[in-house]
Design a protein with these regions (language model features):
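N-terminal phosphate/diphosphate-binding loop that engages ATP/GTP or pyrophosphate donors
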Residues: 1-42
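Conserved catalytic-core segment of NTP-binding enzymes
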Residues: 60-162, 168
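C-terminal boundary of histidine-terminating zinc-finger modules
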Residues: 170-183
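C-terminal alpha-helix
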Residues: 188-199
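Conserved active-site and cofactor/substrate-binding residues in soluble primary-metabolism enzymes
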Residues: 62, 115, 180-187
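Short, small-residue-rich loop/turn micro-motifs
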Residues: 53, 164, 170
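Functionally engaged cysteine thiol sites
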Residues: 1-11, 55, 59-61, 91
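Cytosolic-facing regulatory segments adjacent to core modules
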Residues: 27-83
Length: 199
C-alpha cells in the first residue's frame, strides 16, 4: 500500500525550505534520498515508488525536474530502474526519460494502438537516447492475427494473449506475481526480456 508519493515528498521539502531557515543543497538532497527510500514499498526482489500527480492543473515541470534527479539517484542503488510512463507521447515530450538503456513500448493489437506506438517511437528517436527499443503487443485474442501485426521500424519483442485468469486476478486486486509460471503474461515478459538480453 502506497502511503506517500514522490510528489508528496517534493512538496514537503519545498514547504520546509519556504517556512524555515535557508538550507544547504547537500542537506536537502540527503533528506530527499532518505525519504524516497523510506517511502518505497518493498516487495520480494523489487521496490515500488509512486510518482503521484500535482494537485494543480497544468504544468508538470516541477515534478518532472525532480523526477529526473530521483531517477539518477535511484540508478546507483538498483540493478534496473523501470519507469512506467503514461499512455501516449506526453511522457516522452516532457523529457523525463532523456536516456534509458531499453525503451519498451506496450500496445494492444489494434491498428490505432500500433499507429500510436509508431508515433511514440518517432518522437523518442528525436528526444530519447536508448540502446534498444522494442514493442510488446498484449490482449491478442486470436493467434491467427499475429502475422498481421506490424509496427514500422520497431521489433516486436512478444505477443501476449488475452488471459481470463489475469483479468480475474485484476478484479480481485491480485498482481501478476500471483499468476502461474505458464500464464501468457509471464511467458510474454520472459520472451521480451530474453530478446532484450536482460535474461
Amino acid at each position: 500500500e502506497v502511503k506517500e508519493t514522490l510528489d508528496d515528498i517534493r512538496k514537503s521539502i519545498v514547504a520546509s525550505v519556504e517556512d524555515g531557515a535557508p538550507r544547504e543543497a547537500i542537506e536537502l538532497l540527503s533528506e530527499a534520498r532518505y525519504r524516497i527510500f523510506d517511502t518505497m514499498v518493498e516487495q520480494q526482489r523489487f521496490s515500488f515508488l509512486a510518482i503521484g500527480r500535482p494537485e494543480t492543473a497544468g504544468c508538470y515541470c516541477k515534478v518532472n525536474a525532480y523526477l529526473k534527479e530521483v531517477i539518477n539517484l535511484l540508478a546507483n542503488d538498483f540493478d534496473y530502474v523501470v519507469i512506467d510512463g503514461e499512455a501516449g507521447i506526453e511522457q516522452i515530450n516532457r523529457r523525463v526519460m532523456e536516456k534509458v538503456t531499453h525503451l519498451v513500448l506496450i500496445t494492444d493489437p489494434s491498428r490505432k494502438g500500433t499507429q500510436v506506438i509508431d508515433t511514440i517511437k518517432r518522437v523518442a528517436d528525436e528526444l530519447v537516447m536508448y540502446d534498444r527499443c522494442g514493442a510488446i503487443v498484449n490482449r491478442v485474442t486470436d493467434p491467427a492475427l499475429i502475422p498481421y501485426i506490424h509496427i514500422n521500424g520497431t521489433e516486436i519483442l512478444a505477443t501476449i494473449g488475452s488471459d481470463p485468469q489475469h483479468a480475474a486476478n485484476d478484479i480481485q486486486g491480485l498482481s501478476v506475481f500471483d499468476l502461474p509460471e505458464d500464464a501468457p503474461v509471464i511467458r510474454g515478459a520472459r520472451e521480451a526480456l530474453t530478446k532484450l538480453e536482460i535474461l
